[in-house]
């Protein structure tokens, strides 16, 4: 099954690789229009997935990721249109030179070829990934979780109709429909056809892909994100940033999970934090050194467990720990962080610069919410994933991350001497 799917994807990728930007944008425009025109069918399919997920006891955090609403679907269609407006990186000359031999050499961006994406309860990924892959001339094989089966079928059908309407093969965007887990292992070894693999899910999925794949893997998206509140800080501004980072969308991988507070301001800052978090229904998981200052406050407070520092809450829960100084905060982030997104809130330029240099995450913020780690917020359009590794891409993966390059040499019947 996957052998034929891979072969068809590879053949489709050859057609996509030579498309003009105008043609690719036409496909995306038709795709966005069809998503809106078929919204009723897509939302009905999503309702079926939601009902099955609730019946199996899926957590509220994952249910939120699975849910499509009319507003969310409209926003996704608009994201596709935004990809149309982005510059096409394919064909861009990165650098070049005229060599002493007379050879004119240039390094030019080209598509990767075929990209495989494995993901869980995230139906928006189907559309986001397809739009970015098509813009960059890549074919894609999608393997969504069983939780999104009906939604994925409905959206892939719409995407394939858009491709065929524009005279392109439906095999440019394919989905593995079967929930059989053995097919995941088969996909991981489809290196004859698939050029890059991106898993979007939990730590178990990432571990499986790293250990079993014969295809280069880009991992990331697991976000144990921290914010350090420095001794020199504006309380009101800091609380506003913390509120946004934790509350805006707690199920997102860039939401705040652990707050590190300088001990010297804790007696004054933590009561204000408690009031702010209580208003939003956040449960504070307090370290032993923070517990006495939070107990008796308006927020719900429980003692933190050691393992809580290493896991994503993805909910209205927040770890709170006091640290002696910025270096202790950095040590904690190095020990428990996932290299996703971490922030410092401070009025000290020297502290900010020290934090930025020392924290080795894909996105580091000064006086800003970790929620900004997002392809759209970065001006990249919808993202394929957020990479927390250093090769071949890092941070939100937009269009450039879905390309590689080739060397092209021009000569006049030139031979090497």
UniProtKB/Swiss-Prot annotation:
Species in which this protein is naturally found: Serratia marcescens
* Associated pathway: Amino-acid biosynthesis; L-proline biosynthesis; L-glutamate 5-semialdehyde from L-glutamate: step 2/2
Whichever gene encodes this chain, its name is proA
What reaction gets catalysed by this protein?
Answer: L-glutamate 5-semialdehyde + phosphate + NADP(+) = L-glutamyl 5-phosphate + NADPH + H(+)
Its family?
Belongs to the gamma-glutamyl phosphate reductase family.
The EC class name is oxidoreductase
Q: Give the subcellular location.
A: Cytoplasm
SUPFAM superfamilies in alphabetical order: ALDH-like
Task: Quote the function comment for this protein.
Answer: Catalyzes the NADPH-dependent reduction of L-glutamate 5-phosphate into L-glutamate 5-semialdehyde and phosphate. The product spontaneously undergoes cyclization to form 1-pyrroline-5-carboxylate.
Q: What is its EC number?
A: 1.2.1.41
| HAMAP family, sorted | ProA
This protein's source sits in the domain of life called: Bacteria
The UniProt keywords, alphabetically, are:
Amino-acid biosynthesis, Cytoplasm, NADP, Oxidoreductase, Proline biosynthesis
Q: Which GO terms describe its biological process?
A: L-proline biosynthetic process
The protein's name in its UniProt record: Gamma-glutamyl phosphate reductase
